Amino acid sequence: MAMASASGSALCFTDASSSLALRRDCGALCLPPRTVTFGFVDKPLVNLERLRLSTLKIRASNATAVENGKQEGSAADSDKVPTPVVIIDQDSDPDATVLEVTFGDRLGALLDTMNALKNLGLNVVKANVYLDSSGKHNKFAITRADSGRKVEDPELLEAIRLTVINNLLEFHPESSSQLAMGAAFGVLPPTEPIDVDIATHITIEDDGPDRSLLFIESADRPGLLVELVKIISDISVAVESGEFDTEGLLAKVKFHVSYRNKALIKPLQQVLANSLRYFLRRPSTDESSF
């Protein structure tokens, strides 16, 4: 079982005019934060391991699939490849992170997945299986082995996501060409990479007086969850809850965010959107910019 890891990347403006323009839009709101409120926990911004993610749901799915060179939906393909789905749910259980994996009726007991989770320093405290029209759902409640608590570190949540997807690609390589992760972990990489400029869409709207709703759509890549959290927290915006969907080559994110327990005002919405757009359209960052 190949292991996967994820690491964050800070947002740095190499162009001074870009940084000044963003600060001019929001004034004092753009000052570098001393602490970050993330999932109702105040933590110093020393490194990404200090950030906490208490109410995030991550979903990874393959919108289309290919098996034996035949596209799903082809008349000649009577055995269609099901859609793999990975959900990491922080809402359902206050004491554990809930992991759910579905791939039609093709998955077994997922002993390899449980072993991979143990290699990440996690314990599987409960497991069950249920069936519905979409297939067999393998559900696990997992905690950190060192503390017995649910996983709240964005880097570890991203490592779980990549490990499970890598595990699916290893045992079901037919989906590799349709997943962004296939370029790194699959036997057949995507044939048509996504244009980041075209694929990136960011919108922010009010969701009551105390929080705003942030929607992000962009090209998926390993480590994206951690990187997005870092960018948002860098301008003192707190992520209260959310959902991270990986659909084929795209990442679709929905975050409930707030600034000092209030919805984001328009200037701060613009700064956040500009910061995310600047980062997402620069998929690689020079080490010298850190």
Swiss-Prot record:
Tissue specificity statement from the Swiss-Prot or TrEMBL entry: Expressed in cotyledons, rosette leaves, stems, sepals, style, and tip of pedicel in mature siliques.
Domain ACT: 98-178, 213-283
Cellular compartment(s): Plastid, Chloroplast
GO cellular component labels: chloroplast; chloroplast envelope; chloroplast stroma; chloroplast thylakoid membrane; nucleus; stromule
Induction per the UniProt record: By light.
One GO BP: response to sucrose
Transit peptide, from-to: 1-52
Key words of the record: Chloroplast, Plastid, Repeat, Transit peptide
The protein's role, per its UniProt record: May be involved in feedback regulation of amino acid metabolism. May be involved in the regulation of glutamine metabolism.
The protein's name: ACT domain-containing protein ACR11
Gene symbol of the encoding locus: ACR11
